[in-house]
From Swiss-Prot:
InterPro entries: Rotavirus_NSP6. Belongs to the rotavirus A NSP6 family. Interacts with NSP2 and NSP5. The lineage of its organism: Viruses, Riboviria, Orthornavirae, Duplornaviricota, Resentoviricetes. Keywords: Host cytoplasm, Host mitochondrion. It is found in: Host cytoplasm; Host mitochondrion. GO terms for cellular component: host cell mitochondrion. Its main location: host cell. Pfam families: Rota_NS6 (PF04866). HAMAP family: ROTA_NSP6. It comes from the Viruses. This is Non-structural protein 6.
Length: 98
């Protein structure tokens, strides 16, 4: 398996794991999902430092993961303040949710 195939497999597995966790948001409190998401994001950051360049996600891909997380939280939580707090926790660069 060449580097491009390995990278594609890695990204697909990562997306499946993140997507599976978000589907559980209907069954679990938002705070639990936020903690799980934070672990995933921490793991992504760790992978950035230990993997060869073929496996590293670029800034755009990391940002897409954060955006996906924020969209899922917003979709499954109807309390605006809790949603905003969760999103700020995951992605501190987001100033406000409109």
């Amino acid at each position: 398996m060449n580097h491009l195939q390995q990278r594609q497999l890695f990204l697909e597995n990562l997306l499946v794991g993140v997507n599976n966790m978000f589907h559980q948001m209907q069954k679990r409190p938002v705070n639990t999902c936020c903690r799980s998401l934070q672990k995933i994001l921490d793991h992504l950051i760790l992978l950035q430092t230990i993997h060869s360049p073929a496996f590293r996600l670029d800034q755009m891909q990391l940002r897409q993961m954060q955006t996906l997380a924020c969209l899922w939280i917003h979709q499954y939580n109807h309390d605006h303040q809790v949603t905003l707090g969760a999103i700020k926790w995951i992605s501190p660069l987001i100033k406000e949710l409109k």
